Swiss-Prot record:
Pfam short name (any one): Thymidylate_kin
UniProt xrefs under PROSITE patterns: THYMIDYLATE_KINASE (PS01331)
GO BP annotation list: dTDP biosynthetic process; dTTP biosynthetic process; dUDP biosynthetic process
Species of origin: Camelpox virus (strain CMS)
Keywords of the record: ATP-binding, Kinase, Nucleotide biosynthesis, Nucleotide-binding, Transferase
Residues engaged in binding ATP: 11-18
GO MF annotation list: ATP binding; dTMP kinase activity; nucleoside diphosphate kinase activity
Protein's name according to its UniProt entry: Thymidylate kinase
Family that this chain belongs to: Belongs to the thymidylate kinase family.
Length: 204
């Protein structure tokens, strides 16, 4: 039995990640594909993250970084097991978000990456570009929904994309929604059909 693919959607806040993940789930109706999003706010760490994001509590940046990282590690075994059982996972945000946001706040990218060493490595990361309209939507109730901060996050994403050690697929914000939906579906299907070898380890 071939393993499943780990496909991650990344991008700035309000770039359409969740929408595109749901489009994939609806267009590829199969019992071998599942959706997962981070942070998982139902866990102990997730509830702490939710309190922070919604401004109910404050933590220093180092603690916040570790909370997001721990939240992903809580699901590392689940992800590994699902992939080995032939289940493809469509993941809304992953380690790259954690690193980009931490680095945008001034943390060392190298240090932030080290917390994620060994997580299941994605077979494909789809990065959804944000047009000026989407970026200007980034004013909201949650703590990171700020235009200037999101621009900093974007620069950190670009650094990771340029490193070339992960298979990134950038989706332009200029595509019409129906074109974007079809393009992403085709990219995901190809990734599922071409995945080979054991599950890799992130940044190892």
């Amino acid at each position: 039995m071939s393993r499943g693919a780990l496909i991650v959607f990344e991008g700035l806040d309000k770039s359409g990640k969740t929408t595109q993940c749901m489009n994939i789930m609806e267009s590829i109706l199969a019992n071998t594909i599942k959706y997962l999003n981070f942070p998982q706010r139902s866990t102990v760490t997730g509830k702490m993250i939710d309190d922070y994001l919604t401004r109910k509590k404050t933590y220093n940046d180092h603690i916040v970084n570790l909370l997001f990282c721990a939240n992903r590690w809580e699901f590392a075994s689940f992800i590994q097991e699902q992939l080995e059982q032939g289940i493809t996972l469509i993941v809304d945000r992953y380690a790259f978000s954690g690193v980009a946001y931490a680095a945008a706040k001034g943390a060392s990218m190298t240090l932030s990456k080290s917390y994620e060493f060994g997580l299941p490595k994605p077979d494909l990361v789809i990065f959804l570009e944000s047009g000026s309209k989407e970026i200007n939507k980034n004013v909201g109730e949650e703590i990171y929904e700020d235009v200037a901060f999101q621009q900093k996050v974007l620069q950190e994403y670009k650094k990771m994309i340029e490193e070339g050690d992960i298979h990134w697929q950038i989706i332009s914000s200029e595509f019409e929604e129906d074109v974007k939906k079809e393009l992403i579906k085709n990219i995901v299907i190809e990734a599922i059909h071409t995945v080979t070898g054991p599950v890799g380890q992130l940044w190892m």
